[in-house]
A protein has these predicted regions:
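Terminal amphipathic alpha-helical/low-complexity segments used for targeting or macromolecular assembly
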Residues: 1-71, 180-188
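Eukaryotic, compositionally biased intrinsically disordered regions
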Residues: 165, 169, 176-181
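Structural signal for interior beta-strand "rungs" in well-ordered beta-sheet cores
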Residues: 69-164, 168-171
C-alpha cells in the first residue's frame, strides 16, 4: 500500500476544507460540491492504482471517472510529482503537463502548462497561476510566484516574483520574510 498516496489525499482534503470552511464530512462535501476536487482526486488515484486494488478504491475510481467526464481538466503530469494541497479553481479547459508541481499551488481556469521547445516546466511551492496564463518549455518557476491572467511565460522566473504580460515580465518582487530573517541572522 502506498502511504504517500493516502497522505497526499489527506493533505488535499485538509487544505481544501480549510480554504472553503468545511467542518463536517469533508471528503464527501468536497467530492459532491467541487468538480475540480474530483479532477484532482482522479489524478491522485492514478498514483494509487499500483498501490492498492481494494474494493473501495475501485468503486471510487469508477465514480470519479464518471463525474470527471465532462469537466475538460487534463492533468498529464505523473501523480507522484505533484505536491500536496494543489488547488484547481474553476479548472475547466485546463491542461497541465509539468515535470514537477510544488506544494500548495493554485491554478485557475484555462491555464496551459506544457511542452515548448524541448521540455516541460518545473513549478515551485506556493505558486498562483491566474486564468488563461500559459507556461511553456524547459523552465523553472520559483517559490511564491504569482503569474498574472493571460501571461505567457517562456523563461525562468525567480522566487518571490509577480509576472504579467505577453511575454511575461517581472512587474514586482514580493517580500519574503524567510529570506529577510535569514539575512538578519547572518549579519548578527
Amino acid at each position: 500500500m502506498n502511504i504517500r498516496f493516502f497522505c497526499l489525499i489527506k493533505e488535499d482534503i485538509r487544505y481544501w476544507s480549510y480554504l472553503y470552511h468545511i467542518d463536517k464530512c469533508k471528503f464527501f462535501h468536497l467530492f459532491i460540491r467541487f468538480p475540480e476536487f474530483r479532477c484532482l482526486l482522479k489524478m491522485r488515484l492514478k498514483c494509487g492504482e499500483q498501490a492498492n486494488s481494494s474494493f473501495f478504491l475501485k468503486i471510487l475510481r469508477i465514480l470519479v471517472a464518471i463525474s470527471c467526464r465532462y469537466h475538460n481538466c487534463f492533468i498529464y503530469t505523473e501523480p507522484n510529482v505533484i505536491g500536496k494541497g494543489l488547488l484547481l479553481h474553476h479548472a475547466f479547459a485546463t491542461m497541465i503537463s509539468a515535470a514537477k508541481i510544488g506544494d500548495f499551488c493554485h491554478i485557475y481556469q484555462q491555464v496551459t502548462i506544457g511542452n515548448g521547445g524541448g521540455g516541460i516546466p518545473i513549478i515551485g511551492n506556493n505558486v498562483t497561476i491566474y486564468a488563461g496564463a500559459k507556461v511553456f518549455g524547459n523552465i523553472t518557476i520559483g517559490d511564491d510566484v504569482v503569474i498574472g491572467a493571460n501571461a505567457v511565460v517562456t523563461k525562468d522566473i525567480p522566487s518571490h516574483s509577480m509576472v504579467a504580460g505577453v511575454p511575461a515580465k517581472i512587474i514586482k518582487k514580493r517580500f519574503c520574510f524567510k529570506e529577510a530573517w535569514k539575512k538578519y541572522e547572518d549579519n548578527i
